[in-house]
């Protein structure tokens, strides 16, 4: 078994939650998302993010708008929808429960 693969799978499992959480703070440009996820060591390959953003958009959890750029092509800025806020709230409850359960299991002697 390869530890790197397991670590990647663990990150992928919570990536959607983290992306929604970042977007919930306010409108965000894709490169800002990538930067924060990279700094937090949550994303290794940028190509992982774009399909996820498309899935979130299709599920109506996020929306985006195009903004003209003074240097280059227009930029796509993402924001969370009301449906996305409700979804994120449920994920936050699930995350808290998972952390509690994992802590309980991993701190037993």
Predicted regions, residues:
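Basic, amphipathic "hinge/linker" alpha-helix immediately C-terminal to the N-terminal HTH DNA-binding motif
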Residues: 70, 74-92
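Short, intrinsically disordered or compositionally biased N-terminal tails of bacterial proteins
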Residues: 1-6
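N-terminal helix-turn-helix DNA-binding core of bacterial DNA-binding proteins
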Residues: 7-48
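Amphipathic alpha-helical dimerization/coiled-coil segments
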Residues: 86-109
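Basic amphipathic alpha-helical segments that dock to polyanions
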Residues: 49-51, 55-56
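Glycine-centered, phosphate/nucleic-acid-interacting loop/turn motifs that mediate DNA/RNA or nucleotide
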Residues: 60
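Conserved catalytic-core motifs of GNAT/GCN5-like acyltransferases
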Residues: 64-69
